[in-house]
Structure formats: C-alpha cells, structure tokens
Amino acid sequence: MKILVLNCGSSSIKYKLFDMTTKEVIAQGGIEKIGLKGSFLKLTLPNGEKKVLEKDIPEHTIGVEFILNTLISPEYGAIKSLDEINAVGHRMVHGGERFSESVLLNKEVLEAFAACNDLAPLHNPANLKGVNAVSAILPNIPQVGVFDTAFHQTMPDYAYMYAIPYEMYEKYGVRRYGFHGTSHRYVSKRVCEFLGVNPVGQKIITCHIGNGGSIAAIKDGKCIDTTMGLTPLEGLMMGTRSGDIDAGAVTFIMEKEGLNTTGISNLLNKKSGVLGISGVSSDMRELLAACANGNERAILAEKMYYYRIKKYIGAYAAALGGVDIILFTGGVGENQFECRESVCKDMEFMGIKLDNNVNAKVRGEEAIISTADSKVKVVVIPTDEELLIASDTMDILKK
C-alpha cells in the first residue's frame, strides 16, 4: 500500500510518499514560494541527491499537480502510475473541539474543519487548498485528515480553560488547544516501544523543540497538558515567537508603539523570541555561534530559551505527580546536545541525571542519554509526523 502525505502551508507544500509494507519513504520533497516569484520544487532522489525544479506555481492545485507529475516522471519518478497511490493523508492544523482523532475526509468533515478557520487563519485555509487540489486531480482517491490539535483533546477542562469570562469560551471557543500533537503522540508512543514499557502507568514529558517549540505532559498515553494555547504563541520562547507574556504588556506595547491587532500579532509571532532578544537570528545554530563569539544578547537569549524549557518540565512533573521519562525531539531537541545539557543541569533533586559524554555524541538518533542510575529516563527520539499521518491513513482505510 502506498500513501502520499501532504503538509500544505500558506505558500508551501511538503510531501512524502510511503510504501507502507516496509514503512519506507520512496519519494519526498517540497514546493516553496507558491504564488510568489521564483517558486520551485525541491526533491530528494532515492540516492539522497537533491534536485531543484523551477516552475511558476501560482496556486496550490498547480503545485499538487506538479508533485504528482514528478512522482510519475521518467526522470525523477518513484511510481509508474498515480493509480499506485492508495490514499492521501493530510496534516491539518486546527481541528478545534470537533476532532479528537484522525478522520476520513468528506463534505461534512471539511465543513466542520472550515468552521475552525477563525482559530488558524493562516494554516487551515492552506490545508483545505491541498485537500481540494487532490479532489480536483484524483477525485476517487480517499483522503484522511490528521489534526495537530487532536492529541491534546484529552486535556481536562481545568487545564485548557483560560480564566476570562466564560462567555468567551461559549461564543468563540477561546480555550487552550495545543499544537505539535502529531509529534507528541508519535514520540510518546515510540519511546515506550524503544524502552520496552507499557504506556499505561508511565508519566512522560515530551519536549518538541524546533523553530516552534512545545512541551506536553502525558499520563497513561494521554495528554493532560501542553504549553501552546489557543494559538501556537503561548508557552516556550521560540525562534521568532515570544511564548508566555503578560497580556498587560501586550496592550501597553500597542499603546506606546501605536500598533493595531495585526501589528502586535506580527511583533509577537515574527519578531520576538530568540530573534527578538539576540538581534542575530531565529536559528539556534547561528545563535550558538554568536554565543561562542561572546555576543551578550545572544547569551541572554540562550539562557532565557533553556530556562523556559526547564521551568515547564518542573511544572509538568508537578502536574503529573512525578515523571518517569523526559523526551527530547524536534530540530533542536534531536540535534543540539547543548540544549539538552542546559535544560537537565541541576535537576538531580528530581531524579534526573544526564550522562554528558553520551549526550554530547547524540544527534538525530534514538538514544538514552541519562545515566544508568538516573531515576528518570532521559531519551532522544527523532519525530516522524509524516509516518504517523501515513499510519493513521492506512488504519482508517482498513476500517
């Protein structure tokens, strides 16, 4: 069985084609700059070589068509005919309260998803464009939606509600939803397989640290809390996002700077975080280089970034009533040992002891990085959201 996974952003489409008998990726790539000058498709050939194909891609349907044609092209193809694709799985960002698991996409589901557009005005309409594009080109192929918010739907009300007038929740659905759910679900399940333990009875803290970052508290395989909120702006300090901030500071800045809602949203989402504090970059690799050169603001940004992660681990250990496993994933979590080392430093009182020698060698691979006598297992698990989307799609087809 072959499943195509699509992740459609406002001006991009990432794709992976899986052969589910072996769970192998047989083709992958992405389109950037849809609707802009200089749009292109970048693909990875089976031998690992990368190719860039330039083409004018004014909108998503033409983009999806370009991807499908590339998949069957004599030069770069991975399959002989589009009939070999059994289904398409989509990453859908915001499922609101409607979706707590992955679903087969039909008219009714898509209407309910579109009703959540308010909650993710950038992402949801782009996700829908991808679904509609596939429907237009391959009308008979089954499509499945896998929601970023679904895994967090098990949070109790006292964890997801904001302490604002209750009508705001009733009228507009203002509450905490959380994101990166597909990643948190994948790694929390995978770490139990890796360690050979039953998810039931385990208290796990998963740290998805990338350009965007979130942490989840997971008990018995179910999410009980997560750091992101109504939008991905809450919680950790991120590449360009502020994370937690006093709402009073928001109105104060708006007044002083004469900003409207779009202006303040832009400031908090795109100009804050690591970039805003360091003035160097939103990329942690560039930040570490600046720290090594003694850049004081970069050093401050790094300290703030790690401190916020550490603080939430402590909070979630309290919420869970203890912790058995702490897991790092995401671009930074998987590849930067400095981040893991700083976050776990001086946490022996919680039973967390890192093996710094082992930790320093681990990059993008599954590994236990705590000492043999550490009460808490600290583990690195590379995330694979696309594989989980493909697996969900296959499971739903079998039903």
From Swiss-Prot:
MF-aspect GO terms: acetate kinase activity; ATP binding; magnesium ion binding
Protein's cellular compartments: Cytoplasm
Amino-acid positions noted as binding substrate in the UniProt annotation, renumbered to this chain: 91
Keyword Magnesium: yes
Coiled coil: none
Pathway where it operates: Metabolic intermediate biosynthesis; acetyl-CoA biosynthesis; acetyl-CoA from acetate: step 1/2
Amino acids binding ATP: 14, 208-212, 283-285, 331-335
Domain of life of the native organism: Bacteria
Active site residues of this protein: 148 (proton donor/acceptor)
Name under which the protein is recorded: Acetate kinase
Species whose genome carries this gene: Bacteroides thetaiotaomicron (strain ATCC 29148 / DSM 2079 / JCM 5827 / CCUG 10774 / NCTC 10582 / VPI-5482 / E50)
